């Protein structure tokens, strides 16, 4: 094994450093310099920028295989820091951005789609390591695929519900549906490149899954406690969710939605209570239920923005 490790990391080895930097490039830009990250052979795609790939590989070796150094080099480059906005001219000349004419932008992986609202809401439990956890899942799924329906899924309570998605217990015959909807591999086989789909079911998960509804309520509590003025609350909400301030038109639209939600939940207290009791975390009873439910609706909208679940 030592001989193999020395062979793989030998400066004269033509493959290891190239595969490594291509993988990191793919993580940052969405697509590797060699698009077929799983195949560097003759049947794989040719690199879009072969000289850049070779330079990064030699730089990795020169830096003694310092991954952090290479990542810092890439993210501080002018190429990475470009705006992801596209013009008709750029779209016509470089539709798939293989020429790197604009900054990278794509939907986050399934695990990050779930972790992001937990972090924004303050629910994310940041413990590192430990046993697998079992977050919310629809009732009865395991029974339907188990022998004699004896295998039951029991969700965790407390911090286990809010751990990072990488710690989620994975049953290969019944993977977590919330993450499978966002193209998480089923782990039956090794997957190097994930698919990225865009389906109506994904929007329904973000709007209705208990994880996201509960995160919206916890986020709403943060927003309300931030400031007493709606304008400042909305600014804080946008900064937290999408790392920018709202445009005037966005502010007006969300303000109208907030007013409508306040009116609805004031008239329908049962609907407000039903919304606020989703999930296991404790509800802040110092906030009036109708007000909290209205801001929960606003928080849910912000957490469902394409901008929120996409890498900017």
Question: What are these language model-derived features?
Answer:
Residues 1-162, 179, 185-195, 207-290, ...:
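Primarily short, surface-exposed interaction patches in extracytoplasmic proteins
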Residues 124, 170-172, 210, 302:
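A broadly conserved detector of short glycine/acidic/proline-rich loop/turn motifs that flank catalytic sites
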Residues 170-175, 183-184:
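Short Ser/Thr-interspersed hydrophobic loop/turn segments at strand-loop and sheet-helix junctions
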Residues 298:
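Short, surface-exposed polybasic-aromatic patches that bind anionic ligands, especially phosphate groups
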Residues 301-311:
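Short, low-complexity, Pro/Ser/Thr/Gly-rich segments in the mature regions of secreted, periplasmic
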